[in-house]
Amino acid sequence: MADTSSSQARRPFHRRRKTCPFSGANAPKIDYKDVRLLQRYISERGKIVPSRITAVSQKKQRELAQAIKRARFLGLLPYVVA
């Protein structure tokens, strides 16, 4: 078994940096009445997906969580999915 690491240097894997989907020129506004937009940031169990997975900025994640909670309170979104 030959050691390939000595003959070939391994290149590090560079992951593309994710950008916030709510920042930019034509980015959608976070609104508690926009149920279709909010459902993209809720897991199939009904939990809010963390920003490290969705790449939403910290400020927009707080706005998103507030909008989801407001929509749940008004009955537009379910609290849990069975």
Curated annotation (Swiss-Prot):
Keywords per UniProt: Ribonucleoprotein, Ribosomal protein, RNA-binding, rRNA-binding
InterPro entries tied to this protein: Ribosomal_bS18, Ribosomal_bS18_CS, Ribosomal_bS18_sf
One GO CC term, this protein: cytosolic small ribosomal subunit
PROSITE patterns, per the entry: RIBOSOMAL_S18
Pfam families named in the record: Ribosomal_S18
Domain of life: Bacteria
Single Gene Ontology BP annotation: translation
HAMAP family found in the cross-reference section: Ribosomal_bS18
Subunit organization: Part of the 30S ribosomal subunit. Forms a tight heterodimer with protein bS6.
NCBIfam families hit by this protein: S18 (TIGR00165)
Protein name: Small ribosomal subunit protein bS18
Lineage: Bacteria, Pseudomonadati, Pseudomonadota, Alphaproteobacteria, Hyphomicrobiales
Gene name in the database record: rpsR
